[in-house]
């Protein structure tokens, strides 16, 4: 009779002790994100959250997203500390454009082999994003799945729930001829267009860590965390009439602005109102990318566009800039039955 080796989960590639060590490492940063509506702590089967009492007819708004292949670039450059901010930003910015205040956030972290230091850096970034947006990180799933990912590669996804007063939902229905468009400056490419970014790096043979651009490594420009606009926008909509907000993500100007325009309206963007940040000029030149493709793939320095009545413009600009945003008038809304919903001239 032959003795059989006793196998464990760790022998199969799943280290429960590493998972427990990660939970112990992140508890402190997660606790800092806690809102008063959250009941209980980490470790329950489900997270409990009451609705803020200030809402008369609360409507829940939900969203989920990832960070695309920006994650591949972060892994290649071994820079994991800000990718979590990107993850939160992509979700909460989508919520706030509808007037919603983010309440709570959950993350999904999947890897072939759990590296506690890497995962801790990513989740600490998620907690920082939650702090910036005022929402609680109430839980998540860390999945160690040997054979599913190469080496220590990982993927992340985020899920966020917010709340808005039913009568104050921003859906674009009030947008009309003569409305003014205000831009909020971006921090860089945010989390979109990175498959093209990586292709440009490959074709150009450029090392982003040694290539200098505007006084710092190109890598710093490309991995700058997505700007979170939540607190500035929530204060704006509390004090100013806002008719629509577009978050410029995948699809750029051409596809995101029309999502908030009613029929028979057209957004006219004044290209002379701003200068592209240098990283976009570099991408266009190094990749020989056509102008139309730039505006379809990248935000070109504009993270959000807000439509509001002309009399509100000065007040809105003053509020936004006082809150640290780079805000400017970027265009207008015109009545039009043209199929071309956005014009950049």
From Swiss-Prot:
The name this protein goes by in its record: Phosphoribosylformylglycinamidine cyclo-ligase
Localization of this protein: Cytoplasm
Organism lineage: Bacteria, Pseudomonadati, Pseudomonadota, Gammaproteobacteria, Enterobacterales
Alphabetical list of CDD domains matching this protein: PurM (cd02196)
Annotated family: Belongs to the AIR synthase family.
Cellular component per GO, a single term: cytosol
Subunit structure: Homodimer.
Gene: purM
GO MF annotation terms: ATP binding; phosphoribosylamine-glycine ligase activity; phosphoribosylformylglycinamidine cyclo-ligase activity
Catalysis: reaction(s): 2-formamido-N(1)-(5-O-phospho-beta-D-ribosyl)acetamidine + ATP = 5-amino-1-(5-phospho-beta-D-ribosyl)imidazole + ADP + phosphate + H(+)
InterPro entries: PurM-like_C_dom, PurM-like_C_sf, PurM-like_N, PurM-like_N_sf, PurM_cligase
Pathway(s) the chain acts in: Purine metabolism; IMP biosynthesis via de novo pathway; 5-amino-1-(5-phospho-D-ribosyl)imidazole from N(2)-formyl-N(1)-(5-phospho-D-ribosyl)glycinamide: step 2/2
EC number of the protein: 6.3.3.1
GO biological process, one term: adenine biosynthetic process
């Amino acid at each position: 009779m032959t003795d059989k080796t006793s196998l464990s989960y760790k022998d199969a590639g799943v280290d429960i002790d590493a998972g427990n060590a990660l939970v112990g490492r992140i508890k402190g940063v997660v606790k800092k994100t806690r809102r008063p509506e959250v009941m209980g702590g980490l470790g329950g089967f489900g997270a409990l959250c009451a609705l803020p009492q200030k809402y008369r007819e609360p409507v829940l708004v939900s969203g989920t997203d990832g960070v695309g292949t920006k994650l591949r670039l972060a892994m290649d450059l071994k820079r994991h500390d800000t990718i979590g901010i990107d993850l939160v930003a992509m979700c909460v910015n989508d919520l706030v454009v509808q007037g919603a205040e983010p309440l709570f956030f959950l993350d999904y972290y999947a890897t072939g082999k759990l590296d506690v230091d890497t995962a801790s850096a990513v989740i600490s970034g998620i907690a920082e994003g939650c702090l910036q947006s005022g929402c609680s990180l109430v839980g998540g799933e860390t999945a160690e799945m040997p054979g599913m990912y190469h080496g220590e590669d990982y993927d992340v996804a985020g899920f966020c729930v917010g709340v808005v007063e039913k009568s104050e939902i921003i859906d674009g229905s009030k947008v009309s001829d003569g409305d003014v468009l205000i831009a909020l400056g971006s921090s860089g490419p945010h989390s979109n267009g990175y498959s093209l970014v990586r292709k440009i790096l490959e074709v150009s043979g450029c090392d982003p860590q040694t290539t200098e651009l505007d006084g710092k490594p190109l890598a710093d420009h490309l991995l700058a965390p997505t700007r979170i606009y939540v607190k500035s926008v929530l204060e704006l909509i509390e004090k100013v009439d806002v008719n629509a907000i577009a978050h410029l993500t995948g699809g750029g100007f051409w596809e995101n602005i029309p999502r908030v325009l009613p029929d028979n309206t057209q957004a006219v963007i004044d290209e002379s109102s701003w200068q592209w940040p240098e990283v976009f000029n570099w991408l266009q030149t190094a990749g020989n990318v056509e102008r139309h493709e730039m505006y379809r793939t990248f935000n070109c320095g504009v993270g959000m566009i807000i439509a509001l009545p002309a009399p509100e413009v000065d007040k809105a600009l003053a509020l936004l800039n006082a809150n640290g945003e780079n805000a400017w008038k970027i265009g207008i809304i015109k009545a039009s039955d043209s199929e071309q919903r956005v014009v950049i001239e």
